[in-house]
Amino acid sequence: TEGPYFYVPMVNTTGIVRSPYEYPQYYLVNPAAFAILGAYMFFLIIVGFPVNFMTLYVTLEHKKLRTPLNYILLNLAVADLFMVIGGFTTTMYTSMHGYFVLGRLGCNLEGFFATLGGMISLWSLAVLAIERWVVVCKPISNFRFGENHAIMGVSLTWGMALACTVPPLVGWSRYIPEGMQCSCGIDYYTRAEGFNNETFVLYMFCCHFTVPLTIIFFCYGRLLCAVKEAAAAQQESETTQRAEREVTRMVVIMVIGFLVCWLPYASVAWFVFTHQGSEFGPLFMTIPAFFAKSSAIYNPMIYICMNKQFRHCMITTLFCGKNPFEGEEEGASSTKTEASSASSVSPA
């Protein structure tokens, strides 16, 4: 059922469909589902905010962590905090009420922050892939990834993310409640007159999904070939090769995590867009959308688990300058992030 600034996934043959901005949507699913949704968002908030804030705080406190590669990783933490503060808190509040009680303004803000976080994450992973390709494969001789390049990379991620998330705020497409009507996203559902949803969705999928994914797959495809060649030729020391492999492994796992979280949502969104008017239940979009939101906690978790130096610095921060697990954290100086300035293979 389509209405002004909303689309409820139910045929209004019984006349029970109401605006998700004004009435509880308990006719869509059992009211308990809204409580579960709210509890899930609360979990993401109490986990996502501390780990992302700690990632920022520890990096700013410890000078040795302020490497060019870490600028991009910090950018991911900032994006996740935007999702937690601007998106998750709003969705938890609306879930508790059973409808989007904050109105259109709240919907625009929630949709904007949630989409912004996802876009910054994807473009950050594309920049990381380019960094790994340039550092490891050396397509440009004597090139060193430095602070200026990292700042340019961060600026690119924000520029591209804003190019995707601002248009719906100013009339090219729009943000509307989706699924159980407690969170908002791009309007994939309607051909609302005056909003040009079709052209925006095509622009979004081509320029802000296909392009960064193509960059990621190209860079890592070249990188894998180069790593195999280097291993066969033994052109660099084992320590250098191992450090580069560890950094690359961490970034690849982040990419896989992003795809696991966001690919189901993107696939469902594309299906809805190409099958407008087809019947589907509220959970069809709700489950992928809320699964995608879990991406706000996996990036810092991967970073903490796979980076010895950062883990060591975080523990010393938490324990007031001491590391009670010093023996387990030995070798922290051989870091994954410091390895970003090294190269382990010959030019690709």
From Swiss-Prot:
Annotated Gene3D superfamilies: Rhodopsin 7-helix transmembrane proteins (1.20.1070.10)
Top-level taxon: Eukaryota
Database matches in CDD domains: 7tmA_MWS_opsin
Disulfide bonds: 107-184
Motif ('Ionic lock' involved in activated form stabilization): 131-133
Residues with lipid group (S-palmitoyl cysteine): 320
GO CC entries: membrane; photoreceptor disc membrane; plasma membrane
Post-translational modification: Phosphorylated on some or all of the serine and threonine residues present in the C-terminal region.
Region ranges (Disordered): 327-348
Cytoplasmic side: 59-70, 131-149, 222-249, 306-348
TM spans (from-to): 34-58, 71-93, 108-130, 150-170, 200-221, 250-271, 284-305
Extracellular side of membrane: 1-33, 94-107, 171-199, 272-283
GO biological process: absorption of visible light; G protein-coupled opsin signaling pathway; visual perception
Compositionally biased region (Low complexity): 332-348
Gene Ontology molecular function: 11-cis retinal binding; G protein-coupled photoreceptor activity
Compartments, record wording: Membrane; Cell projection, Cilium, Photoreceptor outer segment
Membrane topology: Multi-pass membrane protein
Residue(s) at site: Plays an important role in the conformation switch to the active conformation: 110
UniProt record similarity statement: Belongs to the G-protein coupled receptor 1 family. Opsin subfamily.
Biological role stated in the UniProt entry: Photoreceptor required for image-forming vision at low light intensity. While most salt water fish species use retinal as chromophore, most freshwater fish use 3-dehydroretinal, or a mixture of retinal and 3-dehydroretinal. Light-induced isomerization of 11-cis to all-trans retinal triggers a conformational change that activates signaling via G-proteins. Subsequent receptor phosphorylation mediates displacement of the bound G-protein alpha subunit by arrestin and terminates signaling.
Protein name, per record: Rhodopsin
Organism from which the protein derives: Sargocentron xantherythrum
